[in-house]
């Protein structure tokens, strides 16, 4: 059963735990009557998230694949929780963009090796990850966003920290929402 952990700044964070797997889901609306929101819906949104979250994300590497609608993305997180014995992590995924008239999805699945991406930090990969960033285009000025994801870490998190990945992603999306709603043309 899904439970709402928090709703901060219009970004709702849901949580569901089944055995060892934890699923998170964010829901939010982004409205700005001064800027066409649909112009932000491409792979550069990940670079914008990086720019807005330098305290959480060390860097994001993006590598074009053979198809224009698919990228290999490596998100290196800052060393969060090292005082609790947690190592620095990175999330490596193959992300495909699917687009229709009023909807864009970025579907990410686990990628096991880095290929051309060279990390200059000592970080460990997240064991397993998947995500779906679903953006419904209500109008050029209004987006409904749902981000569903799960992460399986090599290291077992203490019970009081198991919601931390969701809370960090929620913080990233609060900043994205705030930025997009406050820019002007």
Regions found by a protein language model. Name each.
Residues 1-72, 83:
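Hydrophobic ligand-binding cavity/cleft-lining segments
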Residues 19, 29, 59-119:
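Glycine-rich portal/gate segments that line the openings of hydrophobic small-molecule binding cavities
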Residues 19-23, 101, 140-144:
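Coil-to-beta-strand transition motifs
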Residues 31, 80, 152-154:
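Short coil/turn motifs at secondary-structure junctions
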Residues 178-185:
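Short, highly charged C-terminal tails/helix-capping segments
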């Amino acid at each position: 059963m899904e439970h709402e952990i928090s709703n901060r700044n219009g970004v709702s964070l849901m949580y569901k735990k089944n055995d060892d797997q934890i699923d998170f889901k964010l829901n939010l609306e982004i409205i700005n009557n001064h800027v066409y929101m649909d112009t932000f819906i491409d792979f550069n949104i990940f670079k914008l998230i990086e720019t807005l979250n330098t305290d959480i994300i060390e860097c994001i590497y993006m590598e074009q694949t053979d198809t224009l609608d698919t990228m290999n993305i490596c998100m290196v997180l800052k060393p969060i929780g090292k005082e609790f014995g947690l190592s620095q992590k990175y999330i490596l995924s193959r992300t495909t963009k699917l687009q229709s008239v009023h909807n864009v999805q970025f579907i990410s699945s686990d990628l096991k090796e880095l290929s051309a991406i060279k990390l200059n930090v000592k970080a460990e990969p997240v064991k397993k990850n998947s995500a779906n960033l679903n953006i419904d285009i209500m109008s050029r000025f209004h987006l409904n966003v749902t981000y569903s994801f799960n992460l399986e870490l090599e290291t077992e998190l203490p019970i009081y920290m198991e919601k931390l990945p969701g809370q960090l992603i929620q913080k990233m999306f609060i900043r994205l929402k705030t930025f997009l709603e406050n820019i002007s043309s």
